[in-house]
């Protein structure tokens, strides 16, 4: 079995693959204060509930945008699984040309998404990933990564409103009953939610205009299923896109 690990700023997503089939997946909060042993215990408990033991895992691949945790999970892989993991970054074969001023600046998760998307759809793509930051990535018809845009994520936007406006409460991210809200909580939700839908559609439409390839628009990430139904540009939600990309990169490097 293959263990794929996607480390984001807010969540760590784990997946277990048996060949090309995703057997189990988990989403846990990212905690930079946790030690190797604490993560080892967490993984052990998750695996035990799924009737999986560490020795079932024959290889590991990691994508991380949190450098401090990259090292922790590399050491965990060696200590608990007796495996030297693949880590997405310099030296890893992706099979995708990256047209960026400095390719090393592109987040590993963005490249992983691009690879998975193009492998699945084989056409020009815009990939919208709703994470701590929301990223927009353009892949052309040749399967080349062309760049993209980064915006504050929904949670960051809502938290900023609470932190910077003294009288506004902290509220959950949700679709309100109406854009013309009747109370403060719904008013904040309306501004963030519908404003964010407009942000997504606006950026996607501008990318389409610049790219001139009529790209397919797919969304992934924790809040994709919340925003996608209101968007006029998102065509499909693929919640496991990043995990699938890690599996593909592993296959290209083993």
UniProtKB/Swiss-Prot annotation:
Q: Where does the protein principally reside?
A: cytoplasm
Q: Which keywords label this protein?
A: ATP-binding, Coenzyme A biosynthesis, Cytoplasm, Kinase, Metal-binding, Nucleotide-binding, Potassium, Transferase
One Pfam family linked to the record: Pan_kinase
Cofactor notes: A monovalent cation. Ammonium or potassium.
Which Gene Ontology cellular-component terms appear in the entry? cytoplasm
Q: Its pathway?
A: Cofactor biosynthesis; coenzyme A biosynthesis; CoA from (R)-pantothenate: step 1/5
Q: Which PANTHER family match?
A: TYPE III PANTOTHENATE KINASE
Q: Name the family.
A: Belongs to the type III pantothenate kinase family.
Q: Could you tell me what this protein is called? A: Type III pantothenate kinase
Taxonomic placement: Bacteria, Pseudomonadati, Thermodesulfobacteriota, Desulfuromonadia, Geobacterales
């Amino acid at each position: 079995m293959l263990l794929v690990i996607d480390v984001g700023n807010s969540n760590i997503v784990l997946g277990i693959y048996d060949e090309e089939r995703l057997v189990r997946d988990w989403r846990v909060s990212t905690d930079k204060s946790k030690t190797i042993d604490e993560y080892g215990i967490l993984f052990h408990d998750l695996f035990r509930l799924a009737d999986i033991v560490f020795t079932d895992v024959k290889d590991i691949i990691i994508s991380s945008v949190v450098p401090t945790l990259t090292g922790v999970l590399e050491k965990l892989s060696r200590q608990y699984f007796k495996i030297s993991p693949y880590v997405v970054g310099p030296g890893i074969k992706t099979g995708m040309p990256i047209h960026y001023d400095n390719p090393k600046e592109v987040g590993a998760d963005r490249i992983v998404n691009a690879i998975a998307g193009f492998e699945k759809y084989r056409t020009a793509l815009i990939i919208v990933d709703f994470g701590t930051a929301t990223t927009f990535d353009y892949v052309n018809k040749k399967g080349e990564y062309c760049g993209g845009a980064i915006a504050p994520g929904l949670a960051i936007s809502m938290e900023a409103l609470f932190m910077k406006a003294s009288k506004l409460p902290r509220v959950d991210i949700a679709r309100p009953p109406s854009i013309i809200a009747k109370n403060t909580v719904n008013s904040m939700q309306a501004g963030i939610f519908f404003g964010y839908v407009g942000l997504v559609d606006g950026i996607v439409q501008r990318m389409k205009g610049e790219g001139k390839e009529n790209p397919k628009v797919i969304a992934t990430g924790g809040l994709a299923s919340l925003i996608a139904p209101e968007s006029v540009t998102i065509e499909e939600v693929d919640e496991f896109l990043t995990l699938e990309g890690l599996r593909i990169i592993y296959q290209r490097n083993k």
